[in-house]
Amino acid sequence: MNLNSIPAFDDNYIWVLNDEAGRCLIVDPGDAEPVLNAIAANNWQPEAIFLTHHHHDHVGGVKELVKKFPQIVVYGPQETQDKGTTQVVKDGETAFVLGHEFSVIATPGHTLGHICYFSKPYLFCGDTLFSGGCGRLFEGTASQMYQSLKKLSALPDDTLVCCAHEYTLSNMKFALSILPHDLSINDYYRKVKELRAKNQITLPVILKNERQINVFLRTEDIDLINVINEETLLQQPEERFAWLRSKKDRF
């Protein structure tokens, strides 16, 4: 299987998995044009589309792709049923695509119906988990997002985190504002800064590394607890997550 990223809009990535036969899976095609160009350039045969949630920058290209390739099966959560989804999937179910079984994981927070797809080592996590960050809470609560991230963080160490936006540099600037002396965060920030200076992608990331540099996955880390305790005493990791998310919203 080959993993490909297609840039779209200002900072979106549309992920495409293809096998040796050229069959492909498309994830969150917010715009059809760059996908159609990539399909033509690589001679891919689209088999399926995965949708993680209903926002336009993730679903906007579906109808045009289905019109061009009517055999495509479009998997998505209930909230995408009016966006072109033909196969609604929910937590605990599986989607069998390109000979691989993808587990569906409910991850409410960014939207109430947001889902992710996992088939080792690939995690397509939409706008739930970003490198160095997490999605804004447009519909869900901080508690829901905390539980969603906890699920994703429990996946195998070698999981490839394929998120939908190039937010890594700004996320790492925020992480440095919280833990300015953390060695892992500083090292990763320098690496990301170099990549972005060359206009190179920072994704996918390996989950084992992400747990070290993403403050939203470190709510039980003593260094982070000490920083938060300087401002307010919060006993529960969920409360510390909510504190971080609120800080990031104002950053």
Swiss-Prot record:
Q: Which cofactor does it need?
A: Zn(2+)
Please name the InterPro entries in this protein's record. Answer: Clx_II_MBL, Glyoxalase_II_hydrolase, HAGH_C, Hydroxyacylglutathione_Hdrlase, Metallo-B-lactamas, RibonucZ/Hydroxyglut_hydro
Which residues are noted in the entry as Zn(2+) 1-binding? Answer: 53, 55, 110, 127
A GO MF term: hydroxyacylglutathione hydrolase activity
> Looking at the Swiss-Prot or TrEMBL record, what is one Pfam family this protein matches?
HAGH_C
Top-level EC class: hydrolase
Cofactor: how bound: Binds 2 Zn(2+) ions per subunit.
Where does this protein act, in terms of pathway? Secondary metabolite metabolism; methylglyoxal degradation; (R)-lactate from methylglyoxal: step 2/2
GO BP annotations listed:
methylglyoxal catabolic process to D-lactate via S-lactoyl-glutathione
- Tell me which UniProt keywords the record has, alphabetically: Hydrolase, Metal-binding, Zinc
- So where does Zn(2+) 2 get bound? 57-58, 127, 165
Quickly give the catalysed reaction. Answer: an S-(2-hydroxyacyl)glutathione + H2O = a 2-hydroxy carboxylate + glutathione + H(+)
Enzyme Commission identifier(s): 3.1.2.6
Q: Which family does it belong to?
A: Belongs to the metallo-beta-lactamase superfamily. Glyoxalase II family.
Which HAMAP family does the annotation name? Glyoxalase_2
Function, as annotated: Thiolesterase that catalyzes the hydrolysis of S-D-lactoyl-glutathione to form glutathione and D-lactic acid.
Report quaternary structure and partners. Answer: Monomer.
Q: What is this protein called?
A: Hydroxyacylglutathione hydrolase
> What is the protein's species of origin?
Escherichia coli (strain SMS-3-5 / SECEC)
**The gene coding this protein:** gloB
